[in-house]
Amino acid sequence: EEFGLRGGLKYAEIAVKENEQHIAAIESDASGYVPRGFGFSGSDEQLNKIQDWLKYFDKNTISYFSKGGGGADIGPLHRQTGTPMFGLSIDGQKYFEMHHTAKDVFELVHARELELGTASLASLVYLIDKYGL
């Protein structure tokens, strides 16, 4: 996204050209802080269905699926193909203390917070696979 969305635009272009079928697109680009929920862009029917998945998540991490979400990198695919998209939402209170600063290095990422985000994303993929959208 930092370079004019070129990667996302090219990916969508190739996906359309090759008639690739996507079940969902998922983006995590808000940092590695504690996950809080997911934003979702798709149909209202799909959103109602995935709201029921909250029971599978610890409410202290993933507590919502909100309408509208995804990310800049997967937006072109969503717009060109209608692929539903998810964006991981995090507790961003400290986001600008590190984002694009000298402290914005992997070594300073809190390992446990990153693990919680990874587990949340893996759980989402599992639920999409098991129950579909």
List the predicted regions and their residue ranges.
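Acidic/histidine-rich catalytic neighborhood of metal-dependent amide-processing enzymes
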Residues: E1-I50, D73-I74
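Active-site-adjacent substrate-binding region
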Residues: Y33-L133
